[in-house]
Structure formats: structure tokens, C-alpha cells
């Protein structure tokens, strides 16, 4: 990734994951050789901090097992640390699709510290798949109280725009 963007001085590559606290966590994903074995190219996009989330994709045509899952450790930093480390004052468009951790990231953003013009995020995993519960309601209220208008783009995604 770094090599692809060497000529783009306005792009900064951060190898940390963003979360609500600084810590190291295990990340689970489908092994490369299992993607071929399972016969589903889209399996390469399945990753989670919860192994069970991956196993829940099991169906008659997608017979994934624990042997198909690999894990690595990832260092997390908070959104505020990212902003501080890279001296970011504003963001035009923030896109968040992190397989269920959207709530933790959005909850941790300090809108008094950084200006974000628009935020698009996947909302389907906040309170259970496609269920609007207290977590999603909390984030919607936080965004509205910080001057954002919310648009439901489809059944999975919301756009918050100033």
C-alpha cells in the first residue's frame, strides 16, 4: 500500500486500527488457502475481532470451520491519537466500514477537536444485524447534536453531513 502511494504526499498511511482505547487486540480472518478451498472469493473480505462473527457466515454452500481462520495481533489507537499523531485539523470525508466496530469509533470522536464535513458509516452491526437499538440511537443523537444531517443511504449505510 505504501509503495502505491509514494507519489501522493497528501496521503498518510497509518498501520494501526482505530478503536475507543489504545490496546492490542486479536484480529481473525479467513486463511488465504481456505479462500480457494471454500470456493468463495468474497471470503477474503471477512475479518473480525470476534472469531464467532466469521463462523456465523457458515451455510450449506459456505462450510467454514475454525481451521479456516487465522489470527494476528493489531495495535489499536484512539481516533484522537490518530488526529494528534498526524496533526489532522479537518477531514472532508470520513468513511467507516469496520465490521461492527463503527460504534466504538464514532463514540470516541471529539467533534470539538476536529472538523469533519461528512461521515459515511455502515450501521447494520450496531445492535445486532439490521436492528436499530440504543447504540445506533446514541450515535445518531451525537451526530445530530454536533450539527449533522443524517441520510439513510440504503439498509446498511448512513451519511452524516454538515
Residue ranges of model-derived segments:
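Phosphate/nucleotide-binding beta-alpha loop and adjacent structural elements of enzyme active sites
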Residues: 1-162
Amino acid at each position: 500500500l505504501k509503495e502505491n502511494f509514494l507519489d501522493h504526499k497528501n496521503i498518510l498511511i497509518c498501520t494501526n486500527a482505530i478503536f475507543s482505547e489504545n490496546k492490542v487486540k486479536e484480529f481473525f480472518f479467513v486463511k488465504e488457502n481456505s479462500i480457494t478451498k471454500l470456493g468463495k472469493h468474497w471470503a477474503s473480505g471477512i475479518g473480525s475481532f470476534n472469531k464467532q462473527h466469521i463462523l456465523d457466515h457458515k451455510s450449506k454452500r459456505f462450510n467454514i470451520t475454525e481451521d479456516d481462520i487465522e489470527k494476528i495481533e493489531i495495535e489499536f489507537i484512539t481516533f484522537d491519537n490518530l488526529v494528534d499523531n498526524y496533526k489532522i485539523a479537518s477531514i472532508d470525508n470520513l468513511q467507516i466500514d469496520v465490521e461492527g466496530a463503527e460504534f466504538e469509533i464514532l463514540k470516541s470522536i471529539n467533534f470539538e477537536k476536529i472538523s469533519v464535513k461528512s461521515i459515511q458509516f455502515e450501521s447494520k452491526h450496531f445492535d445486532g444485524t439490521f436492528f436499530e437499538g440504543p447504540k445506533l440511537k446514541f450515535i445518531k443523537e451525537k451526530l445530530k447534536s454536533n450539527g449533522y444531517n443524517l441520510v439513510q443511504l440504503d439498509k446498511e449505510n448512513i451519511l452524516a453531513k454538515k
